[in-house]
Amino acid sequence: MSETAPVAQAASTATEKPAAAKKTKKPAKAAAPRKKPAGPSVSELIVQAVSSSKERSGVSLAALKKSLAAAGYDVEKNNSRIKLGLKSLVNKGTLVQTKGTGAAGSFKLNKKAESKAITTKVSVKAKASGAAKKPKKTAGAAAKKTVKTPKKPKKPAVSKKTSKSPKKPKVVKAKKVAKSPAKAKAVKPKASKAKVTKPKTPAKPKKAAPKKK
């Protein structure tokens, strides 16, 4: 009995060790980074909703929530974010609170913020239209490049230079040949004048004397 007891204890310790090892092997999962919500932020949505409204007295919180919900924003989950966004926009000066206090009143865009909101809308529309038109431009540019490439091998400048060079010695030789015969012709008439001799006049025949009878 004394021998079997330590064997059982050793077996129990052996089974406990791998279990502990398995626990230590499990790596701790790294905290997954929070994904930023795609699309515009809450403050941008609020500014767009206020700028689109035509109420002169300002937009109430209820009307603002309705416009945000119509745009596809989850108002119930992000109720606190909407209130914080309104407060931050009022502090920055982009929104002006016309009625009430805090986030429960009515809000209106500041005149300076209105011009900024219009420019942002125009820039967003221009970017969207530019992104849609980009593939057409690239295709046209590629076609233009392919047409322009065969025009490059027009470089016969070397042939023009070589044709000009032989013309110069030809002009010089022609001038020398023209001058040399002129000099020879001028010398020949002088020699002919020296050789001219006057013809001799023939002697008159003497009359024969008459014979004596």
Swiss-Prot record:
What does the entry's domain section say? The C-terminal domain is required for high-affinity binding to chromatin.
**Residues where N6-(beta-hydroxybutyryl)lysine is found:** K36, K54, K66, K87, K92, K108
Q: Which residues carry this modification: Phosphothreonine?
A: T201
Region of interest called Disordered, as start-end residue ranges on this chain: 1-43, 112-213
Positions bearing Phosphoserine: S2, S12, S43, S67, S106
Residues with PTM N-acetylserine = S2
PTM-bearing positions, type N6-acetyllysine: K17, K77, K92, K121
Recorded hits in PROSITE patterns, A to Z, give: H15
Knocked-out gene: effects: Deficient-mice developed normally until the adult stage. No anatomic abnormalities are detected, mice are fertile and they show normal spermatogenesis and testicular morphology. The lack of phenotype may be due to a compensatory function of other histone H1 subtypes.
User: What does the tissue specificity note say?
Assistant: Restricted to thymus, testis and spleen. Present also in lymphocytic and neuronal cells. Increases in testis starting with a low level at day 5 and reaching high concentrations in 20-day old and adult animals.
Where in or outside the cell?
Answer: Nucleus; Chromosome
**Major location (coarse):** nucleus
Q: Where is the H15 domain?
A: 38-111
The entry's keywords: Acetylation, Chromosome, Citrullination, DNA-binding, Hydroxylation, Nucleus, Phosphoprotein
What family is it from?
Answer: Belongs to the histone H1/H5 family.
Would you tell me the protein name for this molecule? Histone H1.1
Transmembrane domains' residue ranges: none
Residue list for modification Citrulline: R56
